[in-house]
């Protein structure tokens, strides 16, 4: 059986309002390189990746093309994003070549994610899982509360995971999930697959797959990158 062809959708279309920069968050610098450039490099470092599609703000397409230039035999494309995250993912999915079998969806804000995590997610999908997400055990106690702030339940930590990206899917599954999406906001593509009633496998995540949401998050990873703890290539 031929190895599946892997395509990566890098979501970089958000305005990054919580970050508060004068550019979209994907174009914020981290030790001399943008978050977008680092995320694309990590995706290209995954064996078997045939295409990377960057979904960028329509007013930053030229900048995204400059930052997303890659090698390793993969094709890099840049397309404009939509109003909501799911619109942007759908645009990236539609731009992938038709012979891509496995789709990884990655947030550009997780710019220190190692290529090995991309490879692990892709391998789990290739092994038969329709949808795969990386996740880390939760260290804090998590309490469910009602609309008044009163605790309803303390959730068992052993059953909880903090989910990261890239998230991986069989292409047909992700296309079905987006086609069937109902109104309302979703925070990740795995939730759309869950709504279809299909299983989503969680594999071990990586502490390096930080999501940079605020300047404080960026400060926390600068030292890691500068010390070589995260891939700076």
Label each residue range with its predicted role.
Residues 1-9, 13, 188-190, 207-208, ...:
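SAM-dependent methyltransferases
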Residues 2-59:
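N-terminal glycine-rich phosphate-binding loop and ensuing alpha1 helix
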């Amino acid at each position: 059986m031929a190895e599946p062809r892997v395509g990566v959708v890098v979501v970089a279309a958000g305005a990054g309002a919580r970050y508060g920069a004068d550019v979209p968050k994907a174009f914020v610098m981290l030790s001399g390189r943008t978050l977008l450039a680092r995320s694309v490099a990590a995706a290209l470092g995954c064996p078997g990746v045939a295409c990377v599609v960057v979904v960028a703000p329509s007013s930053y397409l030229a900048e995204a093309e400059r930052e997303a230039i890659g090698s390793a035999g993969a094709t890099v494309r840049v397309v404009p994003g939509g109003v909501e995250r799911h619109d942007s993912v759908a645009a990236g999915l539609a731009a992938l070549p038709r012979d891509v079998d496995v789709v990884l969806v990655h947030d550009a804000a997780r710019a220190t994610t190692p290529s090995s995590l991309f490879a692990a997610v892709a391998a789990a999908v290739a092994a038969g899982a329709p949808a795969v997400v990386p996740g880390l055990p939760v260290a804090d106690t998590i309490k469910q509360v009602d609309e008044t702030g009163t605790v309803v339940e303390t959730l068992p930590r052993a059953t909880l995971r903090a989910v990261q990206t890239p998230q991986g899917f069989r292409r047909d599954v992700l296309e079905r999930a987006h086609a069937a999406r109902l109104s309302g906001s979703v925070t990740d593509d795995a939730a759309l697959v869950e709504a279809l009633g299909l299983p989503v496998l969680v594999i071990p995540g990586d502490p390096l797959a930080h999501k940079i949401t605020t300047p404080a998050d960026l400060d926390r990873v600068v030292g890691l990158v500068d010390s070589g703890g995260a891939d700076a290539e």
